Design a protein with these regions (language model features):
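OB-fold/S1-family RNA-binding modules
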Residues: 13, 17, 39, 66, ...
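Flexible helix-coil transition and linker loops at the boundaries of alpha-helical arrays
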Residues: 101-102
Length: 256
């Protein structure tokens, strides 16, 4: 598709943005579908199928929790309330059952997607308050929240996790500082802004010191930190680090 449209109809530099919007519109058209084997192959359906029905079919035939979650997120993000009313109970039933399982990771993610499903049904029927409390109780006692965050691929759900940690734990600045060692760098700016807002300057300086000291162990995080410090994106009076040490560590890392 890209080869056929560029540059006659779409500029090369604008392709990604244009195709993202076009792909969503095509998915919502009941007369067209995307091949599961070839990502950008579009076919005409013999019988119209709504996008909601297609997502439910993919959801139902998948054995993977993570894939089911991806289909559910796509459902929430792209399906209007009226179209989704007849389909959403299947999603809700599955994730409600997952809330009863032994996997804390699945429980946290199931709560988050069920919370988003509230746009289709009466929130009280989902018993979200009770589900949230179950998640909060787990987060209050967990020592592996950095590992949990690594298992969450959705940026919005990572953000939800950060917010729940902040609301649930007195030591949240320390807990969130551990999440800053996660790669790739995605939720980090949001976490850092929250730490700055709460004046957790010693936590931030401690994080920077650990990154410089452990640059070999955290090369991607070191590059992110160094770029922000050297470009003065982070330009605060309370920052306490050695610029010389930062530069020397960077040179050593590049020469290894």
């Amino acid at each position: 598709i890209k080869r056929e449209l560029i540059p006659a109809y779409v500029a090369e530099k604008g392709w990604s943005k244009w195709w993202s919007k076009a792909r969503t519109k095509i998915k919502r058209d009941s007369h067209y579908g995307f091949s599961e084997k070839k990502k950008d192959l579009i076919f005409t359906r013999d019988k119209p199928v709504t996008f909601a029905e297609e997502l439910l079919e993919s959801f139902s035939t998948s054995d993977s929790f993570s894939k089911k979650l991806d289909f559910a997120i796509e459902f929430v993000n792209n399906i209007e309330k009226e179209e989704g009313l007849s389909v959403v109970p299947y999603f809700i039933d599955y994730f409600t059952e997952e809330m009863k399982g032994d996997s804390e990771t699945r429980q946290v993610l199931s709560y988050m997607i069920l919370k988003d499903m509230a746009k289709f049904v009466d929130p009280s029927k989902l018993k979200l308050d009770a589900l949230r409390q179950k998640v909060v109780d787990f987060i209050k006692g967990s020592h592996d929240l950095a590992l949990l965050s690594m298992k969450i691929s959705s940026y919005d759900y990572k953000k939800d996790l950060v917010n729940i940690i902040e609301e649930s734990r007195e030591d949240w600045p320390h807990v969130l500082s551990e999440l800053l060692f996660e790669t790739p760098v995605r939720i980090h700016k949001y976490i850092l802004n929250n730490l700055i807002r709460s004046h957790s300057y010693s936590i931030i300086n401690g994080f920077i010191d650990r990154v410089i000291t452990g640059a070999k162990q955290y090369p991607d995080i070191f590059i992110w930190v160094a770029r922000n410090l050297l470009s003065k994106q982070w330009d605060y009076d309370w920052l306490d680090y050695s610029r010389e040490r930062l530069a020397v560590t960077g040179f050593r890392l590049m020469n290894e």
